[in-house]
Amino acid sequence: MRFNAGVSLVALAAASGITNAPAHGEEDRIEEIQVTATKRMASTQDIPVAVSALTGAALDDLDVDVFVDYLQQLPGVNAGGSGPGQSTIYIRGLASTTPNLTTAGVAGLAPNVALYLDEQPLAQPGRNLDVYAADLERVEVLAGPQGTLFGASSQAGTIRLITNKPRLNETEAITNFGIAFTKGGEMSTKVEGIINLPVTEKLAVRAVAYVDDQGGYIDNVAGTRSARESARFRPAGTMRANGVPVSAQRAGFQGTADLSDVTFLDADNSAIAEDDFNDTQYTGFRFGALYEFNADWRLTVTHARQSIESDGVFFIDPEIDDDDDLSVSRFEDDRLEDDFSNTSWTVEGRLGALDVVYSGAFTDRETDQRVDYTDYLFVGQYLPYYICDSSVSYPGEATPSGTCQPPNMFVNSTTDTTVQTHELRFNTPAENRLRLTAGGFYSDLQLDERNDYTYPGSIVADVFGSPGFSPNFPFTTGFRSDDGPFPAGVIFRNDVRRTDEQFGVFGEATFDVVPDLIAVTFGARYYDIEVDFEGSANASFCNSFQADANAFGTDISDIYNGDGQVTFRGSCDTSLHQTFDTSDTVQSIVDAIGVSEAQAGQIINAINAPDVAETSGVIFKANISITPTEDTLFYATFSEGFRPGLLNRPGGALGPDGFVVPFELETDEVINYEIGWKLDLFEGQVRFNGNAFFVDVQNLQTTIFDPSIVNLFFSANAADAEIYGVEGDFIYAPAGVEGLTFAGAFSILDTEITDVLVPTDDVIEGSELAFAPSFSANLRARYEWDAGRDMTAYIQPQIVHTGSQRSDIIEINAAEIDDWTTFGFAAGVRRDAWSVDLFLENITDTRGELANNFVFDRERVTVIRPFTAGLRLSYRY
């Protein structure tokens, strides 16, 4: 239950480090938090790493549950996306693109922020798992490249969720109940139960279960829409809402046609219009067992299951004029079911002087999503061909006439992801002058995804004298989820299997040059990653006038099988579907099937397409730290990051200006230069941590949707960029006022695209990166006092500000995300076994913008939850 839309992670982490009711004048009033950010236990103040930590106590204090929701409030960290299970995390402004449904799986970029649950990485293509934050020991946020220790996707940082483990010799039971009321929205409720039981002296178990019903607050309002608004009928020069005009290359095929004789039937959503339609339920459990063989060896096994059921959407249409600015018009039902099961195991022990950790995990994630696709109308040039009479789309020399069916469309999307990971590492003793961490890592991911794009109007449209389209069948050369035919109305199907296999060897050594004063660290990681595609992106273009010919579309299995040959499918005439190989030339292909030299060149390129997208290399890290006193640490760091490459479904497609969609994209190279400080001042009353950094980004990966090139999302190494930044956080616990603390944090970013690597106008040199606000900050105060009868009371006001930012580096898809400021307040009373907390979130009812998706030429703005008041009760047995 999102009771904390205005909570700052850094501020909360600061709050978690405050000792309760310290004596006046006592030193070290600010507690140090122990973390494993360097893969060995150490205090946040003793390691030369930019790390913030939020303890389980702070999570309980502030009723934080949904990880991405409160992560968004950390300066320097943003979470782009459009609702539960559909978000991507960005740190320090290293972002390029807006997450979107059709790039959420097989075609999605690997995240550049790694998400860990205990010892296992959970990063998946397109978007991370949305793990409910139940019974956590702490959350660690590591900013900047962490690739030497944490591997792929740790380019911009790493986020670690550390769960509470079973405890021997301790019996514990906790129940939590919460209720919240959102202005103009539905009520939210949640229930959690936690139990820890020692079974024997060597065996203990721990379990947590939860149900969290989050009420909706966005209205699906009645509206109509017709194919008259299609991009096909839009002339060049039309000014789009983001200020970028329609170029001549993207002008509608019939942008100047006389449509007076065309009947446009409206899509009408009045039957599904509903207030507060974006409700969500998180349900799940986690069960763990710990067995201690002896003083040196232990085994921990954990199994977790979680289900998200979500209706509606979490974005609004700012063009709809209503009282609360929380409305959108959707013409088909939107829903999401996102389920995962996760089993992990960790063996910890000692071999002589070495600490040994082996961890493994297996995750199975299944999603079933239905998405209203009607907005595609605004960019889909070929849409009228499928839902209008052919006399409208292809009238010849005549004036267009006939009927266009309602343009309501939807996508049925299913995914099945399985991942296994294994890591073995060794640590030398922490007290040694020379300390070493070294190990190996392996992971194997398989993702099966099928997207059925359904155009109901295609079933009844008069296409060249007959109703609808003939049944469509999948390509037969490789992977397919079924043998067909596709369901009625399914015009396109993306049916793809993606596999990612990773292997890595890593090491990091620290040497105390001058003990207790100067230390140097050197780290390296060798990595080898292969990404492979099978399947197809199938179309129905020829099915309007003949039986299915398996024409057009993309036979992915044929292109990426590495056999040195490919079958041409770019014609409805099946006699031209000839197979060519490495012995063919441009001229021989032109002679054989009569295509242009440019098309023949595409075939030659496809023949030589790679079998897999392979990324391998070595990255390095170097660090020097100086500790003049036990309360002062300064450091300088050089670090690098990487992530997997990718194959493109429409690889080889030819666009304007000679641009060819690449078959393969490489890792983007991230080099980070950083100086930082960690200071405990004024006899432990003040803590001030911070850093300044410069990030050099080469070959930045981005996802592009440009219908003038191809009607599929594709990815490319589109640009080079630079990031300058300063970030910091502080805590002030004045000795003169017992129980009073202040905490805050800030982030300053300056990002710029320095070079454009694609010969199109999609990316512009000098523009900013996405999700990179120039300034963000937060401030909170907390006052605790003895309320008598063994009770402690507190109050906590807070303010959070996020600066304006862009949603994408792709100019035609970019929109401005406005800056916003929100206020929150919390108060509570606690006793030994129970606590009561009151929360007020977004007190000013601000429409804070988290994301703005302009991919389909209309702003769709994801906003924070409106003003919400909540109550939480907790009891410990």
Where is each model-derived feature located?
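C-terminal beta-signal and adjacent terminal beta-strands/loops
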Residues: E32, Y453-P456, V460, Q798-I810, ...
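N-terminal periplasmic accessory domains that precede
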Residues: T88-Y90, T103, V141, S154-F177, ...
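Short acidic/polar hinge/loop motifs at secondary-structure boundaries
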Residues: T103-A143, G193, P235
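Transmembrane beta-barrel wall of Gram-negative outer-membrane proteins
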Residues: K183-S310, T417-H422, A430-S443, R497, ...
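Structural signature of Gram-negative outer-membrane beta-barrels, strongest in the C-terminal barrel
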Residues: L290-N294, A304, F426-P429, G439-S443, ...
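Membrane-embedded beta-barrel scaffold of Gram-negative outer-membrane proteins
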Residues: T346-T374, T627-G651, E664-V726, F730-I731, ...
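Outer membrane beta-barrel strand-and-loop segments of large Gram-negative receptors
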Residues: Y386, S390-E423, F486, Q502, ...
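Gram-negative outer-membrane beta-barrel transporters
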Residues: L436, L517-V520, Q685-V697, F714-I809, ...
